[in-house]
Amino acid sequence: MTRAPRCPAVRSLLRSRYREVWPLATFVRRLGPEGRRLVQPGDPKIYRTLVAQCLVCMHWGSQPPPADLSFHQVSSLKELVARVVQRLCERNERNVLAFGFELLNEARGGPPMAFTSSVRSYLPNTVIETLRVSGAWMLLLSRVGDDLLVYLLAHCALYLLVPPSCAYQVCGSPLYQICATTDIWPSVSASYRPTRPVGRNFTNLRFLQQIKSSSRQEAPKPLALPSRGTKRHLSLTSTSVPSAKKARCYPVPRVEEGPHRQVLPTPSGKSWVPSPARSPEVPTAEKDLSSKGKVSDLSLSGSVCCKHKPSSTSLLSPPRQNAFQLRPFIETRHFLYSRGDGQERLNPSFLLSNLQPNLTGARRLVEIIFLGSRPRTSGPLCRTHRLSRRYWQMRPLFQQLLVNHAECQYVRLLRSHCRFRTANQQVTDALNTSPPHLMDLLRLHSSPWQVYGFLRACLCKVVSASLWGTRHNERRFFKNLKKFISLGKYGKLSLQELMWKMKVEDCHWLRSSPGKDRVPAAEHRLRERILATFLFWLMDTYVVQLLRSFFYITESTFQKNRLFFYRKSVWSKLQSIGVRQHLERVRLRELSQEEVRHHQDTWLAMPICRLRFIPKPNGLRPIVNMSYSMGTRALGRRKQAQHFTQRLKTLFSMLNYERTKHPHLMGSSVLGMNDIYRTWRAFVLRVRALDQTPRMYFVKADVTGAYDAIPQGKLVEVVANMIRHSESTYCIRQYAVVRRDSQGQVHKSFRRQVTTLSDLQPYMGQFLKHLQDSDASALRNSVVIEQSISMNESSSSLFDFFLHFLRHSVVKIGDRCYTQCQGIPQGSSLSTLLCSLCFGDMENKLFAEVQRDGLLLRFVDDFLLVTPHLDQAKTFLSTLVHGVPEYGCMINLQKTVVNFPVEPGTLGGAAPYQLPAHCLFPWCGLLLDTQTLEVFCDYSGYAQTSIKTSLTFQSVFKAGKTMRNKLLSVLRLKCHGLFLDLQVNSLQTVCINIYKIFLLQAYRFHACVIQLPFDQRVRKNLTFFLGIISSQASCCYAILKVKNPGMTLKASGSFPPEAAHWLCYQAFLLKLAAHSVIYKCLLGPLRTAQKLLCRKLPEATMTILKAAADPALSTDFQTILD
């Protein structure tokens, strides 16, 4: 029998999503009579391959095979497949086998599919076509019979393995829609076996005590809100405060997919109804509540939570039934980019302003916060439900909150706490809207401390002391408030952190009846949830609405993800200057109301792009965001938007296909670090193969306003020559890819491939084999699900859509709409590709000779020329300085850099910035040695920036594991072959690059440590943090070996693994010693380990390492803020 492909990662992924996974032969043998063999001597190879590669997966809760199973064939394969497809369509089941088929109706007529009465095909399905005509499947039908094959196709999921490491789905619910059982109700096993973390290496830390298992700190625990009486000793990555009592283990339910849920048996004989999906919730020590807590009356509002009714058929509720379904994070993105007219006032939609300060308004507020009611601004009054006693008693407190809000003078508090930090005359000049005062206006942003003072003052005025309960609770909330507004663009504050150390029993308004000193555990947990709901609303609604009412909050181009708070009065003036400058620079034509209405009513309506600005050091940068204005007939507009997006993705895929097939169309364009590495490596090896290395002349140039200056006529000409030269017909295949990473997280992506009919791989097996042969990593350890395939997309229709996209793009600036008359519409995936194609055509016509014996690179609009001919370098520079109006190409001399002298008269009186002949030449984040052609990384972009705000780090759930994985993932990105290739760089250069990578990792390590929640300290888990540091060296050394195959690097080589560990420890010692109060316990073990490594390393290697770690080479890091 043909040996089955191993594909262990694919099999593991399927086992995590299905109840049972069997090879086809094993599955049939279990059902058939003894002695029946699916594969017999003399069977054709294609059939034996099918049986070996086919996996049968059983869903949770799927029905068993028929009791009277027959192994006789009655129907032909085409008839059987048609019967299964008709049954799936009639039941409206989501099945891969039925993709592209639908039932006939009056609106969609046409001939039915063969052997069916009411099913038509509207898109080809290659899986069906394979089944209908395959001789292997016909032989399989003759061996297993109609009944079993129908059962396999209709009730199971079949997968075919494609060597070496992927598979595709034949039938069953799409894998990307199936959740793992652990995603429904996570269970904690009574005992779990600790495993050694990946990449952890303690061979150089032998002085440490024997580590039993540091992964025990990573083990999952029941989610619990901190409460009084609970010890505060948390493991580093614990998701909660460990309970004093032993966690109760619940059985894991069997999850059934589909619209109808059934009561499924559990191993204990009990039953319950599975929940369709898991929703985030308030973490509690125990999730079920007694009827005394009146859980059925509770539901948090809006996006915070949803309401679940208990099942009447279940005697034992699962641990997450009837629990509060809270969104566990408050995100900073909710208060970014607020719109308004520039007036500093509460928004008309501000919740508290729409409620009367009386008991009726208080009741409405209680319902909105705690009972899930939505704010009602107009319309008839709905029937009100009777409040329980607990919530009825809350009304006076929330009435007082409404009264305090009505009396609070927000504008006066704003002016008091967020004053401008300059002299009055400077402020008066700055508030002028003329462009010369733009820089003064940019400095008038409020600091996070000023914003915190304003918010604190508002909360002190509005929220009474009775709602806080104690000053301790108030201080805890203000501490979290300060942290919240100091987060970066992608920052999140978790509900667990918000409730950390809150004293629930001091909030008497949570009680349903007064005077009880001792309360049941269920009642205490209910009070915890109510308090969590209130604090979540206070931060996520009240504070966020205050910020959106009085500030415009945005990131900048020079401070990574750090947020800047501009008062609305300041930002309105900044925006008016930015709009004026943008209209002067870009050719736009204003549209009338009738034109806008006509544009929106068109079926292929372009999305209306909104223009916003972000600060940069010397002005404002316009950013175009593509969004859809729904307005009336929202459903129709949404369909228009989806249709337009699909066409845009098809056009993008088609241009990428032509670009790959004809690489010369892109000229010298590079699309990323991999392209730069491939091109630069080939150039360096070619130069070093010469008898004598010539002197190289470097030119760096940046095109001014590339996207806005390209003439649309020239762009149409370039694209027309690209896609209309052969009037091709394209085939578009859309498919999904599901894979699981090394941490066990399942990722899904949706892709499309465009080819011509001549290049089409019609069947999935051929298609996946072709993709794996062309790129071994493209589908590694993945499962592919084909969604659709279209074979009639003409190049002329795509070109017409391109013209529509180019000439009908609409930008909304303020309340006015404009259409772009010149340049490339921004905000879409096409913008960069179109710009590269246009400049590539220019290079092919003007700079073909310049690249002789040299190298021309361009990353979008940043040129780099390296040539041994001085006259060619001067010609190239002169051409760009004088401009190429035909392509809208004009460079910015202030950003132009050369390493040779240029006479001022030759360039019209101006001269570019000149560097020495031998220097480190900067280009696109790289430093290129002009003499040796070695490559360093440019870290000057980190100057005066905060690593803490630039690093997106989710620090709540399994914080330690998340921290380790985050650092390792960033390290893998930074350890690029361009810096580690010993054929491009010398050993000394590679050591310098590795040391700087480790030094930046040390800064990231510190940024993660100071963000760890729940008062975590390094001294509480010393072994774990030492393991993280050691794993950085092990991971980097493993990447170094992969980037230098065939080279001797080990103990007898030029760079042993101890060298990587020494550089790593040296970098971390340099950074952590600056924060000795935090890392005092780490410094001693690191120094001891480094001394042990010095004894193992040869003297020559130590000399290279010490030279690489010279502080004079890493002065760029001294200006980093963290």
Curated annotation (Swiss-Prot):
Phosphorylation at Tyr-697 under oxidative stress leads to translocation of TERT to the cytoplasm and reduces its antiapoptotic activity. Dephosphorylated by SHP2/PTPN11 leading to nuclear retention. Phosphorylation by the AKT pathway promotes nuclear location. Phosphorylation at the G2/M phase at Ser-447 by DYRK2 promotes ubiquitination by the EDVP complex and degradation. Ubiquitinated by the EDVP complex, a E3 ligase complex following phosphorylation at Ser-447 by DYRK2. Ubiquitinated leads to proteasomal degradation. The record marks Q169 as: Required for optimal binding of telomeric ssDNA and incorporation of nucleotides at the second position of the template. It comes from the Eukaryota. Residues 306-528, 907-921 are annotated as: Required for oligomerization. It catalyses: DNA(n) + a 2'-deoxyribonucleoside 5'-triphosphate = DNA(n+1) + diphosphate. It is an enzyme of class 2 (transferase). One of its GO terms (cellular component) is cytosol. The primer grip sequence in the RT domain is required for telomerase activity and for stable association with short telomeric primers. The RNA-interacting domain 1 (RD1)/N-terminal extension (NTE) is required for interaction with the pseudoknot-template domain of each of TERC dimers. It contains anchor sites that bind primer nucleotides upstream of the RNA-DNA hybrid and is thus an essential determinant of repeat addition processivity. This is Telomerase reverse transcriptase. The lineage of its organism: Eukaryota, Metazoa, Chordata, Craniata, Vertebrata.
